[in-house]
């Protein structure tokens, strides 16, 4: 079975030494376009024979071979048509090789399994408090209070709003978000509302101080959205979930009805 790295090593050896093949490849930036036209002398006949011997039937679908050089596409007359630089030292299959030959767009191959947190490393920087000691009322005019254990939040109809939880809303900013991320901290404490999975109660997480930069603790952040007279708090960590209330249920995370995600902010 033909070894793909050996093929490209043979192709590279066919260049004359004065063409500075290696230095051109080494100085490419991964941020630059990955395809470009280049003119070279025709390859020797024996090199073309080796190229023509490669076919998809000779390349394993599951072979875990890695390229440390750029992938090269060569025409029948020996002219280099395309070079592609890989964005990471990734495993290559013949599906990737076929994509290189057929792809008309100029792009860098990205690994299929790169986690989101590796692709987008967002930092949120603290700005200021935008609401002091505000009260959150849901669409049924129930106010947010602490449950009897003090560990969770719940909604209840109150005759005296002094019993409602007062929140300080801290605004953050980042280079990648056009929305306004905020934290909800219980006033005069270091307890921050922390989003959980769908239908799970939100937690009150104690922090030593107001975070100046939030990078990993995105459960503490919510995109504050306003539609008409209603306010919504969408989780940054779980973008499809909102802070919500429901009859006989603790304040939790939900995507919508039957839970209530509409709130009004009452300022003191």
Curated annotation (Swiss-Prot):
Sorted alphabetically, which Pfam families does this protein's record hold?
A: IL1, IL1_propep
- Report the main location listed first in the record: nucleus
Sorted keywords for this record are: Acetylation, Cytokine, Cytoplasm, Glycoprotein, Inflammatory response, Mitogen, Nucleus, Phosphoprotein, Pyrogen, Secreted
Q: Where in the cell is it found?
A: Nucleus; Cytoplasm; Secreted
* Sequence segments annotated as region (Nuclear localization signal (NLS)): 82-86
- Can you list the GO cellular component terms from the UniProt entry? cytosol; extracellular space; nucleus
Top-rank taxon, per record: Eukaryota
Q: Which residues does the record annotate as propeptide?
A: 1-112
Modified sites of kind N6-acetyllysine: 82
Q: Which PROSITE patterns match?
A: INTERLEUKIN_1
> Could you provide one GO biological process annotation from this protein's UniProt record?
response to copper ion
Description of its domains: The similarity among the IL-1 precursors suggests that the amino ends of these proteins serve some as yet undefined function.
* Quaternary organization: Monomer. Interacts with TMED10; the interaction mediates the translocation from the cytoplasm into the ERGIC (endoplasmic reticulum-Golgi intermediate compartment) and thereby secretion. Interacts with IL1R1. Interacts with S100A13; this interaction is the first step in the export of IL1A, followed by direct translocation of this complex across the plasma membrane.
Name by which UniProt lists this protein: Interleukin-1 alpha
Upper classification of the organism? Eukaryota, Metazoa, Chordata, Craniata, Vertebrata
